[in-house]
Amino acid sequence: MIEYIKGDIAEITPATVVLDCNGMGYGINISLNTYSAIQNQSNTKLYIYEAIREDAYVLYGFSTKQERELFLLLISVSGIGGNTARMILSALSPSELCGVISSGNDKLLKTVKGIGLKTAQRIIVDLKDKIATSGVETVNSEMFANPGNTEIHDEAVAALTMLGFAQAASQKVVAAILKEEPAAPVEKVIKLALKRL
């Protein structure tokens, strides 16, 4: 079993990274959270989950043990596979996801691509008690669901979702940009968001 892989970043995209470890390149699936954490590094260490199936051997990598722990909790829920769990962890940071589950915010959870209302409710029911003991610090889901600059926020999120980005991921990125630059016009917010999504 692989616990972690440490090596040079040979290639990186928002969804995958190739780590060169002693001349061997490991193709690893990553979330947007992990991408944000490692994109400017030349060398990194990723905590690994191995998904071994009849037709594939897939590696998922995480910049923190907490993110991997949440991934394992998510795939323990009936109907949630590795790619869906990675999509959820791309849309919400570990602390945000814990906040959403703790507060039972199924509306925000179902904005993640591929998650319907029933699945969102199942995640909350199955994981609420486990999240309470996970040790990940939670963020109040209302904090990023309703940022102050709502008009520009809503306009930018609408534009990004029309371009095919997941609503939850778009909301998160736009909220972060408006926190950094509260006076930014909507065009600038969208341009900055496109670089981060």
Curated annotation (Swiss-Prot):
Gene3D superfamilies: 5' to 3' exonuclease, C-terminal subdomain (1.10.150.20), DNA helicase RuvA subunit, C-terminal domain (1.10.8.10), Nucleic acid-binding proteins (2.40.50.140)
Gene Ontology BP annotations: DNA recombination; DNA repair
Region (Domain III): 148-197
Compartment(s) of residence: Cytoplasm
Cellular component aspect of the GO annotation: cytoplasm; Holliday junction helicase complex; Holliday junction resolvase complex
Gene Ontology molecular function: ATP binding; four-way junction DNA binding; four-way junction helicase activity
Domain II: annotated span: 64-142
Keywords associated with the record: Cytoplasm, DNA damage, DNA recombination, DNA repair, DNA-binding
UniProt xrefs under InterPro entries: DNA_helicase_Holl-junc_RuvA_I, Hlx-hairpin-Hlx_DNA-bd_motif, NA-bd_OB-fold, RuvA, RuvA_2-like, RuvA_C, RuvA_C_sf
Segments for region (Domain I): 1-63
CDD domains: UBA_RuvA_C
Stretch list, region Flexible linker: 143-147
Family annotation (HAMAP family): DNA_HJ_migration_RuvA (MF_00031)
Function: The RuvA-RuvB-RuvC complex processes Holliday junction (HJ) DNA during genetic recombination and DNA repair, while the RuvA-RuvB complex plays an important role in the rescue of blocked DNA replication forks via replication fork reversal (RFR). RuvA specifically binds to HJ cruciform DNA, conferring on it an open structure. The RuvB hexamer acts as an ATP-dependent pump, pulling dsDNA into and through the RuvAB complex. HJ branch migration allows RuvC to scan DNA until it finds its consensus sequence, where it cleaves and resolves the cruciform DNA.
Free-text note on domains in this protein's UniProt record: Has three domains with a flexible linker between the domains II and III and assumes an 'L' shape. Domain III is highly mobile and contacts RuvB.
Family label: Belongs to the RuvA family.
Subunit structure: Homotetramer. Forms an RuvA(8)-RuvB(12)-Holliday junction (HJ) complex. HJ DNA is sandwiched between 2 RuvA tetramers; dsDNA enters through RuvA and exits via RuvB. An RuvB hexamer assembles on each DNA strand where it exits the tetramer. Each RuvB hexamer is contacted by two RuvA subunits (via domain III) on 2 adjacent RuvB subunits; this complex drives branch migration. In the full resolvosome a probable DNA-RuvA(4)-RuvB(12)-RuvC(2) complex forms which resolves the HJ.
Stated name of the protein: Holliday junction branch migration complex subunit RuvA
Organism the protein comes from: Phocaeicola vulgatus (strain ATCC 8482 / DSM 1447 / JCM 5826 / CCUG 4940 / NBRC 14291 / NCTC 11154)
Lineage: Bacteria, Pseudomonadati, Bacteroidota, Bacteroidia, Bacteroidales
Gene, per the UniProt record: ruvA
